[in-house]
Amino acid sequence: HWEPYKVGEIVTKGPMVMAGYWNNPEETANQLKDGWLYTGDLAYRDEDWHFFIVDRSKDMIISSGFNVFPAEVDNVIFSHPKVFDAMCIGVPDDYRGESLKAFVVLKPGETCEADEIISWCREKLAPYKVPREVEFRDSVPRSPVGKALRRILREEEMAKRAANK
């Protein structure tokens, strides 16, 4: 039973579900439990059982006890007229547990300050979803098919923070 519009993880079982990860029993144990594949995809359904994927569970940020799906924040920033691309990650925050940091790529010839991006987000998002930090970059990491590679940004950010301690 899955209530309409409630976000949860997609879990599936059947003859076409993979048997496991090649030579990776630890990851297989994390994803397969009693024959059920835990996909890591977070989604909701409507009344007609159409599913809408909102993000990956590994990317979800918990800020002040609230779940934040970074793709939602990415899309708001992407809607700014000066922005070409954007990607958010969670970063450690002593008060909130995690807060959002946005990595923003501007359109050619555009200039923008972090405060402008933060104000844009404040107009469109709940306060706990608004990025606390903005970093402008030439690009954000994506796979060859355009998938957000937040893991790379998290690794870069943690290395920067460790070097500054």
Predicted features by range, described:
Residues 134-137:
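General small-molecule cofactor/ligand-binding pocket signal
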Residues 1-8, 17-19, 29, 33-34, ...:
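Conserved ATP-binding loop and adjacent catalytic segment of the adenylate-forming AMP-binding
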Residues 9, 14, 19-23, 27-30, ...:
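AMP-binding/adenylate-forming catalytic core of the ANL superfamily
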Residues 155-165:
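Acidic/polar alpha-helix N-cap and adjacent early helical turns
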